[in-house]
Regions:
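Amphipathic alpha-helical segments that form the core helices of the histone-fold
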Residues: 140-151
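Short coil/turn helix-boundary motifs
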Residues: 114, 149, 153-156
């Protein structure tokens, strides 16, 4: 699950079972008309750091992080899920606040060890995200990207963090992160 992988590498994954259910006290009428309570459940699901298996699911309400990546239709028996690669998935990975938040948390995690230089941080990011070290060419390109981004992000309150968050988000959006070899 891509959502769980993003939470895990960012250090935000809450492995504990959540207490209660956001859907437990929901009025039946809310289920049919997607009212305020239904929207609240979607908001809870979109901001939760628990594993996806614990997300509150109501038949007609699927959290955005699951819907965009071929979540199985809840009203039907599904033995095999479709696997697609569509533009909405890339747009989600590049623009969704949830993904941006995980990228920023991951950037903070990569920047935390004070003893590391940027090349070592790039290798750390690659190990966390892709379970391998960066090649020499990837490391060189990443250092160039980070330098350019940091120089251009002078309006940001923390240009270094912004550059690393952007770098981490780019890897989160990569095909290599999304697909297991």
């Amino acid at each position: 699950e891509i959502r769980d992988a993003m939470l895990a590498v960012s250090g935000n994954l809450d492995r504990a079972r959540p207490k209660g259910s956001a859907a437990m006290n929901m009025k039946v009428t809310e289920l049919t008309n997607n009212g305020a309570e239904a929207k609240r459940i979607l908001q809870v699901a979109d901001t939760s750091t628990h594993r996806s298996v614990y997300l509150p699911l109501v038949r007609t309400l699927v959290p955005r992080s699951l819907e965009v990546f071929d979540f199985a239709e809840q009203g039907m028996v599904t033995g095999n899920r479709d696997t697609t690669t569509v533009p909405t998935q890339a747009l989600y990975l590049l623009n969704d606040p949830f993904v941006q938040k995980q990228a920023q948390a991951l950037a903070k995690r990569v920047l935390a060890p004070a003893a590391l230089d940027d090349a070592a941080r790039i290798h750390l990011a690659y190990r966390l995200l892709l379970a391998r070290t960066a090649t020499a060419k990837e490391c060189e390109r990443a250092q160039h990207y980070l330098g350019e981004y940091e120089a251009a992000a002078e309006k940001e309150s923390n240009p270094r963090l912004a550059a690393w968050a952007s770098f981490c988000q780019a890897i989160l959006a990569s095909a290599e992160f999304r697909y297991i070899k």
